[in-house]
């Protein structure tokens, strides 16, 4: 392996990999064809939330490990570069649909079996939160594991940490076609299958920084530390334009109904981007088949921000130590004819 490692892509996977290699003492140069966070990592939401704990599998375990380690990982990033990534473990609250109590009880049992004890779920009739969604059943499911991060601040914090540790970031220039870690988002999925999925989100001006995030009827509502609340997002397959439209307005309206505290908060920013969804629906991490010295870190889709620390650590272990901790389902496989 060359003394300098090239990373292609300035989204969350590329930045996390570059940081992990830099903090382990390797010289890194990251190329971003546009600017840091120009793609799917430049949105608003930043929900670091676990998958439902039922039907446990390797992907859920990797995500859980990353969520548990996130507090220390992001604290180190912020300290290294002097930029706050906007991370906080504030928990999550979800309304329970009428008749779903038995299913929620099973979910709570599964969380006890797989999550750390401190992170467990519970049902409550009296949620202690500034931002409480409407619940037709009068019950809410809460957890203490879920965290939030500001995607744009996270990208800026990682870039600052990389540079502070001697790494180089080149914006406005694509990476050369040479051995590298390829973390190029939806555009980089073509050899492996998968597709880009459009998402739209909005940012409201409302200071609820310490409130837990809300997940209700498919909508994420995330209070951030800077006096804003993020709302998202749409899931639009086979749509590649980056314009916001009436689908986002419907999400905003729905969020205001679900959380009446948002009713009068003004919208201060709207965003649309293309998220990379791998064919397997799991992240792609590992060597690029048939291209010695080339590696892939892609397919974060909706969980890229949550998974990035674990993905970066597993790839660094493989590249630097020859230690393979990557679940078999994550290894990149070329699509037929790819």
Residue ranges and their predicted role:
Residues 6-8, 31, 176-187, 312:
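Short hydrophobic core segments
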Residues 11-12, 35, 302:
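Residue-level detector of alpha-helix initiation sites
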Residues 138-175, 179:
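Helical element adjacent to the flavin cofactor pocket in flavoenzyme catalytic cores
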Residues 266-338:
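C-terminal catalytic lobe of FAD-dependent flavoproteins
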């Amino acid at each position: 392996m060359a003394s300098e490692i090239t990373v292609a892509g300035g989204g969350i996977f590329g930045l996390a990999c570059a940081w992990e290699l830099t903090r382990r003492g390797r010289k890194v140069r990251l190329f971003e064809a546009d600017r840091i966070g120009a793609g799917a990592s430049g949105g608003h939401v930043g929900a670091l939330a676990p998958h439902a704990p039922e039907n446990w599998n390797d992907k859920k375990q990797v995500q859980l490990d990353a969520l548990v380690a996130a507090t220390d990982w992001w604290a180190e990033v912020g300290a290294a570069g002097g930029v706050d990534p906007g991370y906080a473990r504030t928990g999550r609250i979800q309304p329970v649909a009428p008749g779903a109590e038995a299913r929620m009880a099973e979910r709570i049992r599964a969380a006890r079996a797989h999550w750390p004890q401190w992170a467990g779920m519970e049902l409550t009739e009296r949620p202690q939160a500034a931002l409480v969604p409407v619940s037709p059943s009068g019950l809410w499911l809460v957890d203490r594991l879920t965290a939030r991060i500001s995607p744009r601040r996270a990208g800026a914090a990682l870039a600052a940490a990389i540079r502070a540790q001697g790494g180089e970031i080149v914006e406005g220039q694509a990476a050369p076609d040479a051995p590298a870690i390829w973390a190029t988002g939806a555009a980089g999925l073509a050899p492996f299958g998968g597709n880009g999925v459009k998402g739209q989100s909005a940012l409201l001006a409302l200071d609820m920084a310490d409130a837990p995030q809300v997940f209700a009827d498919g909508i994420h509502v995330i209070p951030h530390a800077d006096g804003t609340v993020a709302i998202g997002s749409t899931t639009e397959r086979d749509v590649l334009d980056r314009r916001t439209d009436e689908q986002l307005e419907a999400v905003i309206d729905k969020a205001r109904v679900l959380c009446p505290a948002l009713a009068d908060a003004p919208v201060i920013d709207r965003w649309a981007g293309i998220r990379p969804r791998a064919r397997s629906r799991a992240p792609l991490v590992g060597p690029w088949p048939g291209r010695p010295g080339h590696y892939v870190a892609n397919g974060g889709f909706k969980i890229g921000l949550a998974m990035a620390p674990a993905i970066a650590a597993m790839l660094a272990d493989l590249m630097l130590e020859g230690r393979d901790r990557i679940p078999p389902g994550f290894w990149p496989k070329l699509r037929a004819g790819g």
